Amino acid sequence: MKTYQVNKEGYYGEFGGAYIPEILHRCVEELQNAYSKVLESEGFKQEFHQLLRDYVGRPSPLYLANRLSKKYGCKIYLKREDLNHTGAHKINNAIGQVLLAKRMGKKRIIAETGAGQHGVATATVCALMNMQCIVYMGKTDVERQHINVEKMKMLGAEVRPVTSGNMTLKDATNEAIRDWCCHPADTYYVIGSTVGPHPYPDMVARLQSVISEEIKKQLKEQEGREYPDYLMACVGGGSNAAGTIYHYIDDERVQIVLAEAGGKGIDTGFSAATIQLGKMGIIHGAKTLVIQNEDGQIEEPYSISAGLDYPGIGPMHANLAKQQRALVLAINDDEAIRAAFELTRLEGIIPALESAHALGALDKMRFKPTDIVVLTVSGRGDKDIETYLKESGTRTSLQ
């Protein structure tokens, strides 16, 4: 049977690996040697699952969205990651990695963040576990996500605004890697998505795989079968998508649909649709698809959503697209906003702008009445209310 899982060297097909400066070799090697042993140990599993249950509030509900289902002519279940503590899927990964860091004897935690959700999740877990926390965040994102910045500070984290480049997620990641190079002995870098050098893409996917583990059980209870016909998720770096599909990745009965950020349109030069626009390259230690110009320089990505404007893509998803295991759709800003308003009006759920891209993909699909669709709402929309308010003037007529 064809498998889409990672191999021992950290590759998904031709994508992945660890392309890193020499100064980080020891850190990454130490992590490669530790992560599998720790993640598979009984002590870790017990502590991780107890925190997911008692602190995060898992399992997150699998909610049959009746009015949305009626609109699209199929059965749509929403996997409600927006109901987790801190309001998104990011907390699953943050808890796992900080537990790993403690077991590795690290004292200082650093993280990058775009929308601020991963930053808040990491700061939250560091407060819980009494660890020093430094979060790198592009100045553009600091301005558009200031509520999350204040939350991180309140939680005791130091937020360092990054003023290089486009001042967004890519630049924050660059700064976090620089910090790690300078403090290799005592610092653990908590990457928030399925990006970066091996073992990060695999480790983050494993920690997020609790999502698909729960979907299997919940579908069995509600539909009498463990698998849906379609799994849908938004993809920036790819961690909520990886968690959503993890236990279904080799099950060809399930059609995987990934929604990436089309921005102002994939032909406009203002986009973050990496799978459609990217060419093979290396970004943040991984060989994957990267949005770049003729000279191989990484282009600045654009999306209305701070969590999706990354010019790379997790190697798992690059491989799924290459092997045609996943259908990838570019959803532009307007389509995402329309979908966010639609979910709010039909189901009383305000989604994050990132999740709204997955919802925007519903309109591009043709479902049968018997189809079972599971769509992951990766986060709640509180952080995006100002953007929605700006847009709402033109949309008040939406029924």
From Swiss-Prot:
Pathway: Amino-acid biosynthesis; L-tryptophan biosynthesis; L-tryptophan from chorismate: step 5/5
Disulfide bonds: none
InterPro entries for this protein: Trp_synth_b_CS (IPR006653), Trp_synth_beta (IPR006654), Trp_synth_beta/beta-like (IPR023026), TrpB-like_PALP (IPR001926), TrpB-like_PALP_sf (IPR036052)
Top enzyme category: lyase
Gene Ontology molecular function terms on file: tryptophan synthase activity
Keywords, comma-separated and alphabetical: Amino-acid biosynthesis, Aromatic amino acid biosynthesis, Lyase, Pyridoxal phosphate, Tryptophan biosynthesis
CDD domains in the record: Trp-synth_B
Reactions this protein catalyses: (1S,2R)-1-C-(indol-3-yl)glycerol 3-phosphate + L-serine = D-glyceraldehyde 3-phosphate + L-tryptophan + H2O
EC number: 4.2.1.20
One annotated Gene Ontology cellular component of this protein: cytoplasm
Entry similarity comment: Belongs to the TrpB family.
Subunit structure: Tetramer of two alpha and two beta chains.
Protein purpose: The beta subunit is responsible for the synthesis of L-tryptophan from indole and L-serine.
Protein name listed in UniProt: Tryptophan synthase beta chain
Gene, per the UniProt record: trpB
